[in-house]
Swiss-Prot record:
Active site: 10
Protein name (record): Peptide methionine sulfoxide reductase MsrA
Reactions this protein catalyses: L-methionyl-[protein] + [thioredoxin]-disulfide + H2O = L-methionyl-(S)-S-oxide-[protein] + [thioredoxin]-dithiol; [thioredoxin]-disulfide + L-methionine + H2O = L-methionine (S)-S-oxide + [thioredoxin]-dithiol
Enzyme class: oxidoreductase
Sorted UniProt keywords: Oxidoreductase
Function, in words: Has an important function as a repair enzyme for proteins that have been inactivated by oxidation. Catalyzes the reversible oxidation-reduction of methionine sulfoxide in proteins to methionine.
A GO MF term: L-methionine:thioredoxin-disulfide S-oxidoreductase activity
Family according to the record: Belongs to the MsrA Met sulfoxide reductase family.
UniProt GO BP: protein modification process
EC number: 1.8.4.11
SUPFAM superfamilies on file: Peptide methionine sulfoxide reductase
InterPro entries assigned: Met_Sox_Rdtase_MsrA_dom, Met_Sox_Rdtase_MsrA_sf
């Protein structure tokens, strides 16, 4: 089992996307990249911790590759807006890839360079994986548990539509 650690805005949105991908065994919403140990959602939302909302993805590389996960990541959030995804503004919503090894770093660098070659101004941060702090239980599988919640209804369906149209071959049955 491999792991990936991505931040692309609200973790509810990112989690909802990656739970649809075959080979993804588990997605855990949480926090990483800041200076506060064991931060709470409220602390992260205040913006003082410097943590990003992230998802830790456990995946089977025999079914989906890290590079494929990177493709999904970049296609389902805006990697060109600094510290913002839609109406969510703040460093906690930054676009970030935390890598666990040199292979992941190189794959991310290659993907970012390919996007830059297409004239996209990518602001995604690329850093070694820091300590990951799981978010509170009520954040886990949030969209699955709260599909009619207002924010979820607004923000997640467009991401899932994009996922289904571009990555049908990666979807769980």
């Amino acid at each position: 089992m491999q792991q990936a650690l991505f931040g692309g805005g609200c973790f509810w949105c990112v989690e909802a996307v990656f739970l649809q991908i075959r080979g993804v065994e588990k997605v855990t919403s949480g926090y990483a990249g800041g200076h506060t140990t064991h931060p709470t959602y409220e602390q992260v939302c205040q913006g003082d911790t410097q943590h990003a909302e992230v998802v830790l993805i456990d995946f089977d590389e025999q079914q989906v590759t890290y590079s494929q996960l990177l493709d999904v990541f970049f296609a389902t959030h805006d990697p060109t807006t600094l510290n913002r995804q839609g109406n969510d503004i703040g460093t906690q919503y930054r676009s970030v890839i935390y890598y666990f090894n040199e292979e992941q770093k190189q794959a991310a660098e290659h993907t970012i360079q390919t996007l830059k070659d297409d004239d996209l101004d990518i602001v995604t941060e690329l850093s070694p994986a820091p300590t990951f702090y799981p978010a509170e239980d009520y954040h886990q599988n949030y969209y699955e548990k709260n599909p009619s919640q207002g924010y979820c209804n607004f923000a997640i369906p467009p991401k899932l539509l994009k996922l289904h149209s571009k990555f049908q071959h990666l979807m769980k049955n």
